[in-house]
């Protein structure tokens, strides 16, 4: 987390958010574990979600939420909302005030692309193309039919 001092960027070490993400993101994770989870979720799922636990109007903790248990949508005002299924099975619809959402490359501006699913489609297409080419050239590139 940085702030601009003229044309220079300086670490914002005095900011509450800097302390939160750099020293104590929540009660059970070190910053290293938290950021490893962020990167892992982005690489495997394309999205990372954290529930913002607030105290006195400030974010006090960031609790990771399984990307598979969150469904992002746009409400009638075109604002992102998140339908979350919690570990106890309860569900709730939360706003951006309550959820921190980090996404990778997106096609709709709302949901990050799942890199594995996207790669799977590309690999499947390449395999189908290879199979078609192999069949075509095994026949001397002569088409049958007419």
Model-assigned labels for residue ranges:
Residues 1-146:
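Structured, contiguous alpha/beta core segments that scaffold functional sites
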């Amino acid at each position: 987390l940085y702030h601009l001092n003229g044309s220079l960027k300086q670490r914002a070490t005095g900011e509450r958010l800097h302390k939160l993400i750099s020293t104590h993101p929540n009660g059970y994770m070190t910053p290293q574990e938290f950021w490893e989870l962020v990167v892992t979720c982005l690489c495997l799922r394309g999205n990372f979600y954290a529930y913002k636990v607030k105290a006195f109007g400030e974010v006090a903790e960031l609790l990771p939420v399984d990307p598979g248990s969150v469904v992002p949508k746009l409400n009638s005002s075109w604002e992102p909302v998140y339908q979350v299924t919690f570990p106890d099975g309860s569900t709730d619809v939360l706003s951006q005030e309550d959820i921190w959402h980090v996404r990778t490359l997106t096609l709709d501006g709302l949901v990050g692309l799942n890199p594995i699913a996207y790669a799977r489609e590309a690999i499947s297409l390449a395999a189908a193309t290879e199979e078609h080419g192999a069949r075509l050239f095994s026949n001397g590139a002569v088409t049958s039919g007419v």
